[in-house]
From Swiss-Prot:
This is Subtilisin NAT. GO terms for cellular component: extracellular region. The gene is aprN. One of its GO terms (molecular function) is metal ion binding. Subtilisin is an extracellular alkaline serine protease, it catalyzes the hydrolysis of proteins and peptide amides. Subtilisin NAT also has fibrinolytic activity. Secretion of subtilisin is associated with onset of sporulation, and many mutations which block sporulation at early stages affect expression levels of subtilisin. However, subtilisin is not necessary for normal sporulation. In Japan this enzyme, isolated from a process of fermentation involving boiled soybeans and Bacillus natto, is used as a food supplement because it is reported to reduce and prevent blood clotting. Its cofactor is Ca(2+). It is found in: Secreted. One of its GO terms (biological process) is sporulation resulting in formation of a cellular spore. InterPro entries: Peptidase_S8/S53_dom (IPR000209), Peptidase_S8/S53_dom_sf (IPR036852), Peptidase_S8_Asp-AS (IPR023827), Peptidase_S8_His-AS (IPR022398), Peptidase_S8_Ser-AS (IPR023828), Peptidase_S8_subtilisin-like (IPR050131), Peptidase_S8_subtilisin-rel (IPR015500), S8pro/Inhibitor_I9 (IPR010259). It is an enzyme of class 3 (hydrolase).
Length: 381
């Protein structure tokens, strides 16, 4: 009897110990997951020949989880806890570990802007953007809209895999300004014959990880886009994002990016990223009277201005509406680049950019207006 009681006591004690240990392990696991964040881990150029498996091992050995390895950037998107971040920063093969920041669409809320930048002058000459491919790196495009001709695309938003569904309406609006069809309905885009590609990197709330944007730019490079429109941005720089933007430009793509909607703050630049990078054309917004919109970001990085107040364009569901923002100004520049390339298909992206900037109409202090309002008629001469 005593032996039986002893056995029961031992069994109870073991059960209690196991339960406590399991609870402690669960608590540790919960504690670990709560501190995990999304990062981009960059590897040193001397390690460029390192295999994908080896790079994954470097991160995994530190407790990280690799989400995606990039094609043109020697880096990987990963989920890491604080300990893994510290250990990776010490690893001799790692160049940097940076947070995978979140970018947001730059919008606040007829196309008078089409006339304001002199696009109809090129239309009348027969140049409408034919044979020019424009990647709209945004929230997707409603491909069923009767005023849009979407030729292809891809989604890099894990939870929203259809690039032709636009939950925020932002990308569809941007697409219409670039290339709404000349079909007697709705609105007219800057380059109505340009080929639109929906590259989805923002979710239905208008937000997206930098790693999603990097994937989108890499897709544009691999698919030989001529123009990239990025009506998005964030307040924080990223080595990986700059690397892929620079790669896009060195690949011959014209890259237009929204300067941001942060307004002015004395002599401090409020231009966001990726527009802040020198390789992009940073676009600010003016109204129909060529006055800088109060929300338009300012700074020495600002390159040109375009209409961005009460811009009427396409919306999901076959509808239309007016939005404000440097997001709305940027597609005027992307569309203008498409018009120029349709007239001068042998021009390089550097030539297109130089013409857009050198022929812009002076509006005032470059800190607030860059080179001025684009004039695509003059730029295409």
């Amino acid at each position: 009897m005593r032996s039986k009681k002893l056995w029961i006591s031992l069994l109870f004690a073991l059960t209690l110990i196991f339960t406590m240990a399991f609870s402690n392990m669960s608590a540790q696991a919960a504690g670990k997951s709560s501190t995990e964040k999304k990062y981009i881990v960059g590897f040193k150029q001397t390690m460029s020949a390192m295999s994908s498996a080896k790079k994954k091992d470097v991160i995994s050995e530190k407790g990280g989880k690799v989400q995606k390895q990039f094609k043109y950037v020697n880096a990987a998107a990963a989920t890491l806890d604080e300990k893994a971040v510290k250990e990776l920063k010490k690893d001799p093969s790692v160049a940097y570990v940076e947070e995978d920041h979140i970018a947001h669409e730059y919008a606040q809320s007829v196309p008078y802007g089409i006339s304001q930048i002199k696009a109809p002058a090129l239309h009348s000459q027969g140049y409408t953007g034919s044979n020019v491919k424009v990647a709209v790196i945004d929230s997707g495009i409603d491909s069923s809209h009767p005023d849009l001709n979407v030729r292809g695309g891809a989604s890099f938003v894990p939870s929203e895999t259809n690039p032709y569904q636009d939950g925020s309406s932002h990308g569809t609006h941007v697409a219409g300004t670039i290339a709404a069809l000349n079909n007697s309905i709705g609105v007219l885009g800057v380059a109505p014959s340009a080929s639109l590609y929906a590259v989805k990197v923002l979710d239905s709330t208008g937000s997206g990880q930098y790693s999603w944007i990097i994937n989108g730019i890499e897709w544009a490079i691999s698919n030989n886009m001529d123009v990239i429109n990025m009506s998005l941005g964030g307040p924080t720089g990223s080595t990986a994002l700059k690397t892929v933007v620079d790669k896009a430009v060195s690949s011959g793509i014209v890259v237009a990016a929204a300067a941001g909607n942060e307004g002015s703050s004395g002599s401090t630049s409020t231009v966001g990223y990726p527009a802040k990078y020198p390789s992009t054309i940073a676009v600010g917004a003016v109204n129909s009277s060529n006055q800088r919109a109060s929300f338009s970001s300012v700074g020495s990085e600002l390159d040109v201005m375009a209409p961005g107040v009460s811009i009427q364009s396409t919306l999901p569901g076959g509808t239309y509406g007016a939005y404000n923002g440097t997001s709305m100004a940027t597609p005027h520049v992307a569309g203008a680049a498409a018009l120029i390339l349709s007239k001068h298909p042998t021009w390089t992206n550097a030539q297109v950019r130089d013409r857009l900037e050198s022929t812009a109409t002076y509006l005032g202090n470059s800190f607030y207006y860059g080179k001025g309002l684009i004039n695509v008629q003059a730029a295409a001469q």
